[in-house]
Regions:
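Conserved lysine of the Walker
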Residues: 29
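NTP-dependent small-molecule kinase module
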Residues: 8, 151-163, 167-227
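P-loop (Walker A) phosphate-binding loop of NTP-binding proteins
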Residues: 24
Length: 227
């Protein structure tokens, strides 16, 4: 077990615990959110695509519908975030609102699916919305190599993920690394998940729970891989 600690001041804190889970596709966000919520009896909120009215159109024509999709996600996540913040219970959210702007809309713009004009308009609206939200207490970043992510995605075989490539995952991974180097809204707990089975190994989950409960004052990386 190897812990690397690097202190960096975070933003202000809310009177209650609000934790957001971030990470690439297939990193294990939903699994961790479910288990932390169950273990600590916290409110949980999950990323959902079932009722998203823009997804079918988006997958049919990404260039035409990328802006609409990102605006929908912004409103949905802001509403989800505020509901969690109003709830007196501690809460953990599957996917942060920040990733939409700094990772996914940026990727759409980079690949030519989101026009410059639309991208700038979206980022301006994003800044206005996020500026009105209180900062979370902690961001948990799940870090995982691209080859492991790809294997997990292929194993779970979701229809909407059939077009995901290692090139796309690598692009997202590079954006995550760049974003987190500058992120100072709240403390960040980075967890390597390529060899950390908190689904089937109770002790691994307990280690993560313990670190989250400490309400970190800086940045810490957990690496539970065998040496």
């Amino acid at each position: 077990m190897n812990f690397v600690y690097n202190r960096k001041n975070g933003g202000g804190h809310m009177p209650k615990r609000l934790v957001v889970v971030a990470g690439n596709i297939g990193a294990g966000k939903t699994s961790l959110t479910e288990r932390i919520g169950s273990r600590l009896d916290w409110r949980t909120d999950f990323e959902t695509v079932a009722n998203n009215p823009y997804l079918p159109d988006f997958y049919a024509d990404m260039r035409a519908w990328s802006f609409h999709l990102q605006i929908y996600f912004l409103g949905h996540r802001a509403d989800q975030y505020l509901e969690a913040a109003r709830d007196p219970r501690p809460a953990i959210l599957d996917r942060s609102i920040y990733e939409d702007a700094y990772i996914f809309s940026r990727a759409l713009h980079h690949m030519g699916n989101l026009a410059e004009r639309d991208y700038l308009a979206y980022r301006k609206l994003f800044d206005l919305v996020v500026g009105s939200l209180p900062p979370p207490n902690l961001l948990v970043y799940l870090k995982c190599p691209v080859d492991v992510l790809m294997a997990r995605i292929q194993r779970r075989a979701r229809n909407m993920e059939t077009g995901i490539s290692t090139t796309y995952l690598s692009l997202l991974d590079s954006f995550y690394e760049e974003w987190l180097r500058a992120f100072d809204i709240c403390p960040v707990l980075t967890i390597r998940t390529d060899d950390l089975d908190y689904v089937n190994q109770p002790m691994a989950l307990e280690v993560v729970v313990a670190r989250i409960q400490e309400r970190l004052g800086g940045k810490e990386e957990i690496d539970l891989r065998s040496k």
